[in-house]
Structure formats: structure tokens, C-alpha cells
């Protein structure tokens, strides 16, 4: 996609995000659906769309670590833990951090933690940079169906009018690995 078309698609996506709606976009392995993490209305729309219970918690995807800092508590990390995390970012590894009390429950669910990732997908980096904050990110699929890997699959599952940022996934076969930021425990193999 040329830069003008990509810029137009990102601008259109930001308009949708500002309306507290949900968008779809390519990530490292599959298409994701996401929204503004600071909008309870938008997050509830996403959860309803996915038939996902609010208590499960969500993942935030960001262009850089600074975008994630308002949502996580990194004060307990040792230098070695930071080094491990930053050696994997940007990239397809999600880390679960402690969350401060200010992080909304619609993001953390029943947990006192939040899963976050600094992406290396160029389109998502550009989208998060243009929006100025991370996005809630979960796989683009309806309950019981496989995650979408193309724009056509997103439109088939969510409808032709669903707002999609066109682009290619990063080509990975598996979703992101998920690890505990403090212990390194593996929650999901990538």
C-alpha cells in the first residue's frame, strides 16, 4: 500500500476510534479488532462483538513503551527483567505487567495486571503513533470461528461495512507469545 493510501486509511481509522467504535487491522500473525482503551463504551462494544466476558481482561498494543506506561506499573521490575522485556520488543511477545489502581477494570478484568505489547508491525506502529496511544487488541474473529488473516475474511465474519485498515499481516503463523513480566512464566506459546 502506498503511503498516501495508508495515511488515508489510518486517518479514517482514527475517525472511527474517536467515535468510540471498533476497527480491524493487521497484526503480526492475524487481523486484530481494537478500540480506544480509555473509552468504556468502545471496549464494551468490542467485548459484545467478540462475545467475550469483561472479566477475562484484554491486551493493549502500542507503537512504543511510553504509550503503555500510563496503564502499567513497572516499578517492581529489576534491571534484568527490563533487559529481557526490551530485548523482545518491538515484536510479537506480550508481557503481563502489574496494573496500577488507575487502570480501568474494563481493561484488566478480574486481574490486577494488564497484558501489553510493543508491536513491530509497521501499519500498527503508524496507527498507534497517529492516534497517540495504544489500542485494545484482540484477534478478529467471532466466537467459535478461526481468526481472520485477510481483509476479505474480516468482511466475511463482521460484514462488508465493518471498518478495516487494509494491509497484510506480518506472516507469523501463531498469535503472540504471552509471558509474565516479573516471573517470565509462559502463559501462551507464540
Swiss-Prot record:
Domain YrdC-like span(s) in chain numbering: 7-190
Substrates-to-products reaction catalysed: L-threonine + hydrogencarbonate + ATP = L-threonylcarbamoyladenylate + diphosphate + H2O
Family under the similarity heading: Belongs to the SUA5 family. TsaC subfamily.
EC number(s) stated in the UniProt entry for this protein: 2.7.7.87
Location(s), subcellular: Cytoplasm
Function of the protein: Required for the formation of a threonylcarbamoyl group on adenosine at position 37 (t(6)A37) in tRNAs that read codons beginning with adenine. Catalyzes the conversion of L-threonine, HCO(3)(-)/CO(2) and ATP to give threonylcarbamoyl-AMP (TC-AMP) as the acyladenylate intermediate, with the release of diphosphate.
Biological processes, Gene Ontology terms: regulation of translational fidelity; tRNA threonylcarbamoyladenosine modification
UniProt-recorded Gene Ontology molecular function terms: ATP binding; double-stranded RNA binding; L-threonylcarbamoyladenylate synthase; tRNA binding
Keywords, ordered alphabetically: ATP-binding, Cytoplasm, Nucleotide-binding, Nucleotidyltransferase, Transferase, tRNA processing
Species this chain originates from: Shigella dysenteriae serotype 1 (strain Sd197)
Pfam families named among the record's database cross-references: Sua5_yciO_yrdC
GO cellular component: cytoplasm
Protein name: Threonylcarbamoyl-AMP synthase
Gene: tsaC
Superkingdom of the source species: Bacteria
Transmembrane segments annotated in the record for this chain: none
Residue stretches in coiled coil: none
SUPFAM superfamilies per the UniProt record, alphabetical: YrdC/RibB
Amino acid at each position: 500500500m502506498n503511503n498516501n493510501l495508508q495515511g488515508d486509511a489510518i486517518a479514517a481509522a482514527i475517525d472511527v476510534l474517536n467515535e468510540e467504535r471498533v476497527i480491524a487491522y493487521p497484526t503480526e500473525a492475524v487481523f486484530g479488532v481494537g478500540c480506544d482503551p480509555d473509552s468504556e463504551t468502545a471496549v464494551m462494544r468490542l467485548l459484545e462483538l467478540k462475545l467475550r466476558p469483561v472479566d477475562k481482561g484484554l491486551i493493549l498494543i502500542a507503537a512504543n513503551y511510553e504509550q503503555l506506561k500510563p496503564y502499567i506499573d513497572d516499578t517492581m521490575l529489576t534491571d534484568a527483567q527490563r533487559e529481557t522485556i526490551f530485548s523482545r520488543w518491538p515484536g510479537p511477545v506480550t508481557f503481563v505487567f502489574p496494573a496500577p489502581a488507575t487502570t480501568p477494570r474494563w481493561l484488566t478484568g478480574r486481574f490486577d495486571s494488564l497484558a501489553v505489547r510493543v508491536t513491530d508491525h509497521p501499519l500498527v506502529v503508524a496507527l498507534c503513533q497517529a492516534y497517540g496511544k495504544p489500542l485494545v487488541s484482540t484477534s478478529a474473529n467471532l466466537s467459535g470461528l478461526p481468526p481472520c488473516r485477510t481483509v476479505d475474511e474480516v468482511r466475511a465474519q463482521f460484514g462488508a461495512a465493518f471498518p478495516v485498515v487494509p494491509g497484510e499481516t506480518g506472516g507469523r503463523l501463531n498469535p503472540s507469545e504471552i509471558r509474565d513480566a516479573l516471573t517470565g512464566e509462559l502463559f501462551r506459546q507464540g
